[in-house]
Amino acid sequence: MEVQKGLIEAFYNTYPLEKAKELDKSPLCSEYELFIKELWPSIVESFHNSTEFETAIRFCCYETARKSEIGLEERLKCLFAILDLLVIGNEINESFCDHLLPFLILEELMDIHTVNECAKLYEYFETRPSLMKGIVSNRGRGPVLLRISNELLRRLSRQENSSFCGRIDILLSKAFPPEERSGANLRGDYNTVHSFGKVELSPPSTPISDRTDLSYHKKLNTLFTAYWDLQCMCSNPPKLLASDTLPKFIDAAGSAIQAFESILQNTFFNGKSNPTIDPNSSSLLSEKYITLDKGFPSKYIYSRSLFEYQLSDEDFRLQAILQLIIIFDFLLDHSKERIERRTLEKWTNKAVIPIVILSDEDTSKLNELSKEAYSFLHTARCGSVQRTIKEIIHIEGNWKLWKGLGCPSLEKPLVDKAAIDEAVEGLKKLTNTPVKLRFAMGNAALSRLWEQAGENTLDDLKKEERYRIPSPESFLSGVKADKFEIEEAVRDDDKHFHEQSLATKTWRAFRSAINSHLQNFSDTGLGDVELLCNSIEGKPTTSKITPSIPPAFDIHIIEGEELLEEMKKRENVKHNSQNFASPMQTDAEGDIVQNEEEKESVEVEEGKHKNDLPKVSPKPPTEGVDSEVNGESLVQVNKVLKSEDDNTSEASKDPSSHVKSPENIEKLKQNDDHFEVTEEITSTINSKISEKQENNVAETILEVTSSPKSSENSQKQSEITKKRGRDEEDEPSDLHSSPKRPKTGEDGEIVL
């Protein structure tokens, strides 16, 4: 005792405990560390060796723990101040102070304190995380910490001290990595300590007379046996894979789930109300035994008399369903599908690789039961519990995969120095000034478009005019401006630029109107935007020739002036051919005869034919057709009629020549078929022009109008043609004018 007192006195003389407690408010702070470094030489001089110093520390800790006159908080402060001295002393001089001494002293103190006091002592590890750095489970402070923690877990009750158990597990998870062998359970062993024995049903205490009550009690007894048999089988899951146990488990689980569903639908108790318990009953436990945390599952008593009340408890049914879902997932790990998946994942831990393989029938039954259990959860708790359980099962699948791969380290290895150097070089290249590109936006077109955009932003792309089809009227101002610039242009390149711009705007205007105003295209002349806009607005339009545009712009709706002149000439030739094709009355010698009514109606019909002429759409000239035909070509027709009498024989060979002979004409006059002959001759002319474009137009007219007996008549017609040609030379031809019919006298001769 004197040695003990001497050591304790020597320690307190060199180490002022009160001042140490004041400085140690923040555990292992820098001020406290400086204070210990100043005192350490005097502490070392007070003791002969490290053993004497360690013995003095133990005596001081035991004496402080025995002092009952001071409170627990004050005793803990003194103990923590002494233990902190050991930690700092080990950093100063490892040979004089062992690094295991604080842990060993705490292990000894845990054995002489109660559970509540141990919970306070365990705070020393939680408030000093620096002690957990570099700790391993197989040497140094690691095994001591594991012994302290495991011993406390064995002493603690999971129901009454659940929070303290959680603190221990959290500290161990922070101190040791997940792949630590001591906590990984590599073999997948199950805790079979709380196993059930064989379930025996005791007979009811009171006899049952009513048949309804008899069937109800029989059903209740069957469910009681099935439920507690499930508890016996679930206490050791590997035994469920036996051939004689698995069918019993499937039947018992199915009956339990069906009973829980019938209770949920109020059909299990045969119309009776759910059993209730009198809250004032003296048989109930006191409040301190039943006020437990709602997050901790209750532990139910095995009793037939209480089973009816347990079934009415929703938490009881929920706990049973969750237990079944976990067991179903364990059994389905032995199905063929999951085993094949694990083969592909290349599991290396053979201890957890399933050996027994379920049959397809058992797999389908377990899948159906699992679906029924999840459906019950969805109905009972509106799907919230169901989603939580599915997420937990999914996370557990990841832990199974990790354990099957041999619990590899979850920490990523350090990056190789070569990879770091490569990354640094890449960053330097990114920070260097890039080479200036020829085109900032990738090509010339995009760069020019970007420069023209100016201060336009992405909001401008949302404007309506960016995606709305423009109206033809929107191009009219631009077309007028381009026409003005073309007229005022001095340089050829400026004129060329505005001609291209005019062609583009014209094409876009007609393209925008093609779906809505196609009917107005006939009033636009040869592609005039102004005429198109006037036609759309309902204004009267007049024929207007659009300036010629070079064909290099590929604008097909606008033609040049030369093509326009050729179209006019072709229309004049066609009108003249229709004039010669009109039927006339002839006498026996072939002379033209005209009665008085026809004389009077000649002038009237002249005005009609001006409006009756069909509109001919302009067509581009084709090869083989003479485009120089004009009003003077009719004079050349008379010369051809005089000089080429041999062609009349070829005309008589024409299948349609019998229609044009004088005899047939006389017959047609008798049958009053004057207009039919006219239509047939006109159609013949049109067909000849389209089929024989390589021949001269005058030859086609000669072929239709000539006959063997009309040589004298053709001579008279040539004189008329000469006179008509001279008149047409004096007067310019009009695109919409019609040729006049020749006037004849009473004897049928033509009056010039």
UniProtKB/Swiss-Prot annotation:
For the keyword Phosphoprotein, the answer is yes
Annotated Polar residues bias: 695-718
Phosphoserine modification sites? S202, S582, S707, S738
Query: Which is one Pfam family of this protein?
Result: efThoc1
| Positions of region (Disordered) | 596-752
Question: What is one term from the GO cellular component aspect held by the record?
Answer: THO complex part of transcription export complex
Record's keyword annotation contains Cell cycle: no
Q: Which UniProt keywords apply?
A: Phosphoprotein
Bias class Basic and acidic residues marks the residues at 601-613, 641-677
What InterPro entries does the record tag this protein with? THO_THOC1
Q: Which GO terms describe its biological process?
A: mRNA export from nucleus; poly(A)+ mRNA export from nucleus
| PANTHER family associated with the record | HPR1 (PTHR13265:SF0), THO COMPLEX SUBUNIT 1 (PTHR13265)
Instruction: Please state what the protein is called.
Output: Uncharacterized protein P25A2.03
